[in-house]
Amino acid sequence: MKQLSEKRKEKFSAKRVAVLGVLLALASAMFIVESLVPPLLPMAPYVKIGLANSVVLLVIILFGAADAFLFVLAKNLLTALAVSFFVLPFNLAGSLCAYLAMAAMYVLLYPKVSLVSVSIAGAIVSNIARTGVAVLLMEAPSLYIQLPFICGLSVLAGIV
């Protein structure tokens, strides 16, 4: 029983909470700065480079997939408060799908695949999810035509 309480204390240690808080602030700031930059594709303003997803990958590596899931939810809530709740469906879909792809690849395939590959997968899945949300909200299936080009950009974004 004593071991369980020690593990719980370690999970909620001041250092751990502080590091996660700093990383949350960093990811949120990166997203906010990225949202101030004009869209890369004027015809697809919902497509983002996804710099904050690199911080999510770091949280997966340092703290594990469970903490990273809560981190993604907190990041989306903070950025929605700071930027706009209008973009929340796009951001939440992109972030959660990128998280799922990166966590699965990291847990199941790393070190057989590189961290760059994990990041690229997260970027591709994020932009596919964002496009899917745009198709649903705008009722415009023709937006899927942009996916090959968007996925190409996602590879570049994942490398960054």
Task: Identify the function of each model-found stretch.
Residues K2-V59:
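Hydrophobic transmembrane alpha-helices
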